[in-house]
Amino acid sequence: MKLVFLGTSAAQPTTRRGLSCTCLKVEGEILMFDAGEGMQVPYLRSKLGWNKKMRIFITHLHGDHCLGLLGLLQTMSMQRRTESVEIYGPPGTDEFVAANARMLGFSPSFPVIMETTEEGTVVDAPGYEVSACRAEHSVEAFSYRFSEKGGPGRFSTEKARGLGVPEGELWGTLQGGSAVSVGGRTVLPSDVLGEGKRGRTVGFSGDTRPTDKLAEFFQGCDYLVFDSTFADEMVKRARETGHSTAAEAAALAKNAGVKNLILTHFSARYSDTDDLLREAQKIHPSSYAASDLLEVEV
């Protein structure tokens, strides 16, 4: 599993940073969080592929988070994509996509499935879930949390044989999480499996103020990608615009027991992110600054 940062700038691009877009590669599938203008070039450079299974999650309808959608859909059509694309976003996302497609006279070569984001579980896939929580921004906005479903613990052949379970199909049944019957006795998966494997979790804040609700939502995340628009000296501006400082992001991550914090969405006023990172690391040492084309193994 890998995080790929395609755009890490806030509101407007810089010569070194594009607009908001982060992808999570999950076993051949692309989960994209926001699609800011200009995200196609870094997408190409990251070699993520045009025809893989894809779900797109829009946090809110500000241009720096969604204006790349139509261009992305058009390019995938020109690449003769046939696999459907699912797009999740706040109310109005479907209208935004449909209106732009209509004005451009564009009809995609593949099904585009639009879903309106609400709090709670957004996607329940075989290997993972994506859930949403309301963020605190200047427009209706959502944060997302990816949760990998845990796997079964290690299968003990010694215990299975000791319980009289013959090798073969019944072993597979137990490993799959179902009980079996042997000689009139029921053998449970817990009788032969070790402690289950914990799934990995990744949070994506989008644009937001740090709130207690989000701290609870992101509790225990392995990685948290969080709005870090401003340095601490501009906390007043952060409050006025519905954003966070790097220090505020770090405080939330610390309170939520987040293992690794990744700062992103930096104001264009900052030519580099060193000062913001230092402010965050004073509070949460396992803090890192994202940069365009950065890839992080999860």
Swiss-Prot record:
Alphabetized, the UniProt keywords read: Endonuclease, Hydrolase, Metal-binding, Nuclease, tRNA processing, Zinc
InterPro entries annotated for this entry? Answer: Metallo-B-lactamas, RibonucZ/Hydroxyglut_hydro, RNase_Z/BN
Q: Does the keyword Zinc apply?
A: yes
The answer to whether keyword Lyase applies is no
Instruction: Give GO terms: molecular function aspect only.
Output: 3'-tRNA processing endoribonuclease activity; zinc ion binding
Q: Where is the active site?
A: D64
Binding note for cofactor: Binds 2 Zn(2+) ions.
Which Pfam families does the protein's record reference?
Lactamase_B (PF00753), Lactamase_B_2 (PF12706)
Instruction: Write down the required cofactor(s).
Output: Zn(2+)
What are the binding positions for Zn(2+) 2 in this chain? D64, H65, D207, H265
What's its top-level EC category?
hydrolase
Which residues hold Zn(2+) 1? H60, H62, H137, D207
What EC designation does it have? 3.1.26.11
Catalytic activity of the protein: Endonucleolytic cleavage of RNA, removing extra 3' nucleotides from tRNA precursor, generating 3' termini of tRNAs. A 3'-hydroxy group is left at the tRNA terminus and a 5'-phosphoryl group is left at the trailer molecule
Q: Tell me where on the tree of life, at the top rank, the source sits.
A: Archaea
Q: Describe its partners and assembly state.
A: Homodimer.
Q: Which family does it belong to?
A: Belongs to the RNase Z family.
Function according to Swiss-Prot or TrEMBL = Zinc phosphodiesterase, which displays some tRNA 3'-processing endonuclease activity. Probably involved in tRNA maturation, by removing a 3'-trailer from precursor tRNA.
By what name is this protein known?
A: Ribonuclease Z
Source organism of the structure? Cenarchaeum symbiosum (strain A)
Q: Which gene encodes it?
A: rnz
